[in-house]
Amino acid sequence: MKVIPLGSRLLIKPIQEEKRTEGGIVLPDTAKEKPMKAEIVAVGNLEDADVDLHVGDKVIFSKYSGTEIKIEEEDYIIIDVEDILAKIED
């Protein structure tokens, strides 16, 4: 299934980082904070937005923004470009 965001929205896939305590215990998903890093999977019409974002870019976004959806058992978020706080460059 292909999802194309409308307007100045992005489809992002949260980057899950494994969390361990100092003692080496892996925390379950329910004990983790919401991820704030994601990879852009699809972009809407960003002509009016003054941003340089493309598919494959990694970004930091506001913690409780966007709409969470599932596509083929994978978690994604549809988010407004204004809720993107920063672009991560490696």
Swiss-Prot record:
SUPFAM superfamilies the UniProt entry points to: GroES-like (SSF50129)
Domain of life per record: Bacteria
GO molecular function: ATP binding; metal ion binding; protein folding chaperone; protein-folding chaperone binding; unfolded protein binding
One of the protein's GO biological processes: chaperone cofactor-dependent protein refolding
UniProt cross-references to InterPro entries, sorted A to Z: Chaperonin_GroES (IPR020818), Chaperonin_GroES_sf (IPR037124), GroES-like_sf (IPR011032)
Localization (cell): Cytoplasm
Pfam families: Cpn10
Subunit structure: Heptamer of 7 subunits arranged in a ring. Interacts with the chaperonin GroEL.
Family statement: Belongs to the GroES chaperonin family.
Protein name: Co-chaperonin GroES
